[in-house]
C-alpha cells in the first residue's frame, strides 16, 4: 500500500491522474472485501486515483471448496490434492466460517479406498484450543506435520483458521483431509494458497469436491473500489520476429472469443 500511495502522492504533486496496476496474487483472506489490504485499496482509490488488480491465473484449479450447512449435515469434509509434479507436498489452507458463527477444524488421514477417517488431529475451535501442531502417527501412511491457528476477525466478525500442511510422503491409499464444522444455516469456505494444491472428494460420498468458484485473488478485485482484469482470448496464433507462426493450445486457454480457461 505504501508504494501505491507514493504513486498517488507524486501524481497529485504534478497535477496528473494516476492508475496503478497490481498483480500480486494471493488466496489468503475472506474474499469479501473486508481484508486489511482490500479496505486500504478502497480508501485510497477515488477521483484521479485508480487501482487495477489482476484477477489471477487459477481459473482452472479447484483451489476453493465451500458448503452451505444444513440440519443433520453441519460439516464440510474435503481432501487435499497435490500435483504429481510437485517436489514438496505443501498446503496453505485459509478457512472461513460465517459471520458470528462458531467454527471447529481438524486435520485427518483418510482411507482413499473407503473414504473413512483413519486418524485425526486435535481440533481448533472457537470456544476451545486456538493453536495446534500435530504430527500424524507412525503407521498412518502419512509422514506429515500439520499446524492450525484460529482467530476471530474483528472487522467482519468471521472466524478464520489457517492450516499449514507439509507432507514428506503419502501412501497411495491415503489422503490428507480437513473436517470443518459449524452451525446449520451457515456456510464454510476454504482456499488453498499453495501453488500446486487443490481440493477433491476422491469420489467418496460425504466428501466435497473442490471448485473454481471464488477464485478471483484477494488483491485482484474483491475490494469495492478495485477494477478487476482477467484474460480474454483475442487471437489463436502469433508470429515471432523471425517470422515463425505459432498456434495457441486451446486445451490450455480455451477458444477464441472466450474467457481464458486459466483466468480466475
Task: Give residue ranges: language-model regions.
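Loop-rich non-cytosolic ectodomains and luminal regions
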Residues: 1-264
Amino acid at each position: 500500500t505504501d508504494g501505491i500511495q507514493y504513486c498517488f502522492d507524486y501524481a497529485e504533486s504534478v497535477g496528473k491522474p494516476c492508475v496503478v496496476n497490481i498483480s500480486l496474487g494471493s488466496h489468503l483472506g475472506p474474499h469479501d472485501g473486508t481484508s486489511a489490504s482490500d479496505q486500504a485499496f478502497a480508501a485510497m482509490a477515488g477521483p484521479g486515483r485508480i487501482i487495477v488488480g489482476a484477477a489471477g491465473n487459477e481459473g482452472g484449479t479447484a483451489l476453493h471448496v465451500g458448503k452451505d450447512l444444513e440440519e443433520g449435515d453441519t460439516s464440510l469434509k474435503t481432501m487435499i490434492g497435490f500435483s504429481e509434479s510437485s517436489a514438496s507436498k505443501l498446503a496453505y489452507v485459509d478457512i472461513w466460517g460465517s459471520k458470528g458463527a462458531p467454527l471447529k477444524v481438524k486435520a485427518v488421514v483418510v482411507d482413499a479406498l473407503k473414504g473413512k477417517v483413519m486418524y485425526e488431529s486435535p481440533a481448533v475451535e472457537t470456544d476451545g484450543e486456538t493453536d495446534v501442531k500435530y504430527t500424524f502417527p507412525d503407521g498412518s501412511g502419512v509422514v506429515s506435520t500439520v499446524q492450525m491457528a484460529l482467530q476471530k476477525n474483528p472487522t467482519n466478525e468471521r472466524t478464520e483458521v489457517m492450516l499449514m500442511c507439509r507432507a514428506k510422503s503419502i501412501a497411495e491409499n491415503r489422503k490428507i483431509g480437513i473436517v470443518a464444522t459449524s452451525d446449520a444455516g451457515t456456510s464454510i469456505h476454504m482456499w488453498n494458497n499453495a501453488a500446486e494444491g487443490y481440493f477433491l472428494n476422491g469420489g467418496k460420498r460425504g466428501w466435497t469436491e473442490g471448485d473454481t468458484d471464488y477464485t478471483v485473488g484477494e488483491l485482484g478485485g474483491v475490494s469495492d473500489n478495485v477494477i478487476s482484469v482477467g484474460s480474454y482470448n483475442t487471437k489463436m496464433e502469433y508470429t515471432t520476429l523471425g517470422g515463425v507462426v505459432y498456434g495457441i493450445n486451446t486445451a490450455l486457454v480455451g477458444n477464441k472469443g472466450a474467457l481464458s480457461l486459466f483466468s480466475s
